[in-house]
């Protein structure tokens, strides 16, 4: 009885048997699953590449002998390994020997309060945030998109005040969107 049932095909006005329709539905389902598997493999490859870069970056940071050189190592590692065109870091409330270092200069009380108010990294357009001014402009192009990462002890969403801010920028308005 079921072999004689005819159903209209979604790919035309012709009638097809129930078995043909079920086989067609299974082919479509398999095709969808294949796409999902390809996406998972692609994501896995991306994750492996990111893990390798993070490992290279942290290894380079561990090789820094002088704490004075650490902020520059953080910034240069991010720019080179992660292809971030613009990056800067500022820290405040530092020990005496570091008080005049470049990485401790230029953070106003407003910028410090703003960094402390961030309970998660900000990613989006450059809306004229003061920390965007800390970035060196590559080829005269100002940052159109930013990632602002507060530096604090403990979890990023803790009530602990930030002791610094890592700023990533790009002339591409969608890079950190």
Enumerate the language-model features and the residues they cover.
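Regulatory sensory and allosteric helical modules in signal-transduction proteins
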Residues: 103-147, 167
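Signal-transmission linkers at sensory-effector interfaces
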Residues: 14-60
């Amino acid at each position: 009885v079921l072999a004689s049932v005819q159903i209209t095909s979604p790919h035309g006005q012709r009638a097809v048997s129930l078995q043909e329709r079920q086989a067609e539905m299974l082919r479509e389902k398999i095709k969808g699953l294949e796409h999902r598997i390809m996406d998972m493999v692609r994501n896995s490859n991306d994750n492996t590449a990111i893990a390798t870069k993070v490992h290279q970056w942290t290894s380079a940071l561990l090789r820094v002998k002088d704490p004075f050189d650490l902020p520059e190592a953080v910034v240069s590692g991010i720019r080179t390994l992660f292809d971030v065109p613009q990056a800067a870091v500022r820290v405040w409330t530092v020990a005496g020997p570091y008080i005049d270092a470049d990485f401790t200069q230029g953070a106003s009380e407003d910028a410090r309060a703003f960094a402390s108010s961030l309970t998660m990294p900000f990613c989006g357009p450059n809306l004229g945030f003061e920390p965007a001014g800390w970035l060196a402009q590559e080829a005269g192009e100002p940052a159109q998109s930013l990632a602002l990462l507060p530096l604090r002890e403990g979890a990023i969403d803790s009530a602990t005040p930030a002791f610094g801010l890592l700023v990533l920028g790009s002339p591409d308005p969608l890079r950190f969107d």
